[in-house]
Design a protein with these regions (language model features):
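Sec-dependent N-terminal signal peptides
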Residues: 4-16
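Lipid interaction determinants
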Residues: 17-76, 82-129
Length: 129
């Protein structure tokens, strides 16, 4: 009986962990930022600042990622999904690269919440256009 309970519990945990993975297809498109919060030190952009800067993140089917800010491309590179992590490789001027992850906290059909993985993390809420 104990063995059956163990296998049932183990199976439930495995299935639950698999359902947390996010498919890149769910991200494709343009996501306009509606809130940007920095947690240490506490700070956030006002609604007026967001309207003026019009920040967005764009995911394409060829695994390219672009971040726009102020009507211009702020950052670009490639990404791959790893569970709930967006593994972003940013292409820098001069041919360099920088890798960093974003953690997806929430994802719906039109809503996305993600954050950086630094100690002084930033959380972004976005709406799909």
């Amino acid at each position: 009986m104990k063995i059956n309970i163990f296998f049932i519990s183990f199976s439930v945990l495995v299935l639950a962990s698999c359902s947390n993975a996010i498919d890149a297809d769910e991200l494709y498109g343009r996501w306009d930022y509606i809130a940007v919060e920095n947690f240490n030190p506490p700070d956030s952009l006002t609604k007026e600042e967001l309207i003026a800067q019009a920040p967005a993140i764009l995911f394409s089917k060829d695994n390219k990622l672009v971040i726009e800010w102020g009507g211009k491309q702020l950052s670009h590179g490639t990404y791959k999904m790893d569970g709930k992590m967006i593994r972003y490789t940013e292409f820098l001027e001069g041919g360099g690269k920088r890798e960093f992850p974003f953690l997806i906290k929430e994802l719906g059909e039109k809503d996305l919440v993600f954050q950086t993985m630094e100690q002084n993390y930033t959380r972004v809420k976005a709406k799909k256009r």
